[in-house]
Curated annotation (Swiss-Prot):
This is Aminoacyl carrier protein 1. It comes from Bradyrhizobium diazoefficiens (strain JCM 10833 / BCRC 13528 / IAM 13628 / NBRC 14792 / USDA 110). Keywords: Phosphopantetheine, Phosphoprotein. Pfam families: PP-binding. One of its GO terms (biological process) is lipid A biosynthetic process. Aminoacyl carrier protein. Can be charged with L-glycine via the formation of a thioester bond between the amino acid and the 4'-phosphopantetheinyl prosthetic group, catalyzed by the bll0957 ligase.
């Protein structure tokens, strides 16, 4: 399991908090907290997906748009880190 990346984690937390603020919600967003439990709706998840793509300048592959990857900041961070790593030749 790869170690967490503080910069990536903080940027994702900032995105989540921004969406919560737009909805006039405040929550303690921890890396392990389930995003639905802190108040994100399915539409918020779409906005979060778009925000992640814009923030990290990549398109999330269809195969990575799964409930498992959007469960928490931690799972999102793992997916982002995987996408940001340069492709290795087989």
């Amino acid at each position: 399991m790869q170690a967490f990346n503080t910069d990536v984690r903080n940027r994702i937390i900032k995105l989540v908090k921004g969406i919560l603020e737009q909805n006039a919600l405040a929550a303690d967003v921890t890396p392990q907290a389930k995003l639905v439990d802190v108040g994100l709706t399915s539409m918020d998840m779409v906005n979060l997906m778009l925000g992640v793509e814009a923030e990290f300048d990549f398109t999330i592959p269809q195969s990575e748009i799964t409930p498992e990857n959007f469960q928490s900041v931690e799972t999102l961070e793992r997916m982002v880190m995987t996408q940001l790593q340069p492709a290795t030749a087989a």
